[in-house]
Amino acid sequence: MFTAPGVAATRERPYSCSVCGKSFQYSAVLLRHERAHGGDKRFRCLECGERCARASDLRVHRWTHAGQTLYICSECGQSFSHSSLLDLHLGTHRRRSSTCPCRLCGRRFPHVSALLLHRVRQHPPEKPHRCPLCARSFRQSALPFHLARAHPPETTIATAPAPSTLYHCTQCPRAFHSSAGLRNHSRIHVVPSLSDPGAEAHRCGVCGKSFSKSSTLTRHLQRHSGEKPFKCPECGKGFLESATLVRHQRTHTGEKPYACNDCGRCFSESSTLLRHQRSHQGERPHICATCGKGFGQRYDLVVHQRSHTGERPFPCPECGRGFTDRSDLTKHLRTHTGEKPYHCELCGKRFTCISNLNVHLRNHAGHKPHKCPECGKSFSVASKLALHRKTHLGERTAECTECGKFFSHGRSLSQHQRSHRRARAAAMAATTTTTVVTEMTIGPSLTLTGPTEQEKSGLLVSTFQETC
């Protein structure tokens, strides 16, 4: 069966190297690997002249000249200059091999947090037993407890209100469909006294704080005892609640399931996404005192102010490059480790961050909501529209340091600078070839001299005669 380049036929590794037998998930990765066997070694070390098939191999080779300790991955043999980078890289192997299966449907997930979210959304616990008084549903074991606590014996089915009746709280705007719900809610507005036996039953013996429910008191007591029953399998950190553990695990996996529909930016928590969306709605209460720019979140203002002060508190341990935000450093580290955990289900292309994947998916869907008011051209993200509008305004802010040419945005400058790099590489290759040919034809003991004036004139005459 023919498979389009770059698209995996299955989730296995169907593309095998005919030389060493190593398998790959995508054909493009196999082609890059085969360069090492085929002698296509375009990257040359300036110190010793050794050539490598990939830029990453050349970078590892140069560490040997610096006398730097190398950390080798036992799974694939890739080398790293720092142990922290090796740890990040090993996570890619763990996620591939130790997937988490769902016991109910068999679907597999790369990490525990994704499995937990799947079970909550797709397999919620069955609650077939409905309360006849308030219409709430419970598992069989929880229904008797609910009836005894929320509906005392004096409550009967005959006196139950119609479902459309609402019970309003006199202390706040909230309303409830049952008197029991209002009763439970009203406890948060009452400061219990020491003479109240109900308050005494749910009072903390350590600090004296009272609670309306025994389950709330139990969770509170865990703070005093230091008990944290929900442990992170990655780092061992404990948490009081499973929901907090799920949010913490996203710091290990980099998972950001909440995406902004306007700009593609992703967040690990829904509350952070809601705060971010204020910026698209015009709400920017946090103002920079230096330039007057507004932000929807205070943290975004703090990160922005570092652009004025030059502060970059998050340096890369591999190349020393500094970043204003920890998340930017995390994404940058993946360029060293080669980790691309997010892949497109349609074409197999992989990405270092989920926001780039979301933007890429818009290209498949043809969704380009950002339209230029000048020419009508549409773009998938607002940042590309902003760059495009500079061409209408005639702004050229990106300058090439080699030739002084200006460009309207950084991508055009990067493409232009590649031409300088290609020219330098071609000149270096030509110099190397000339040196090799000279040594082979003349020999080390002879001295190469230029042609005499008479030879030059004869050469010119012969060349002219050949072309006529």
Curated annotation (Swiss-Prot):
Assigned GO CC terms: nucleus
Location in or out of the cell: Nucleus
Keyword vocabulary terms for this entry: DNA-binding, Metal-binding, Nucleus, Repeat, Transcription, Transcription regulation, Zinc, Zinc-finger
Zn-finger region bounds: C2H2-type: 15-37, 43-65, 71-93, 100-123, 129-151, 167-189, 202-224, 230-252, 258-280, 286-308, 314-336, 342-364, 370-392, 398-420
Pfam families cross-referenced by the UniProt entry: zf-C2H2, zf-C2H2_4
Single biological process term from Gene Ontology: regulation of transcription by RNA polymerase II
Gene Ontology molecular-function annotations: DNA binding; zinc ion binding
InterPro entries: Znf_C2H2_sf, Znf_C2H2_type
Sequence similarity: Belongs to the krueppel C2H2-type zinc-finger protein family.
Role summary: May be involved in transcriptional regulation.
Name of the featured protein: Zinc finger protein 672
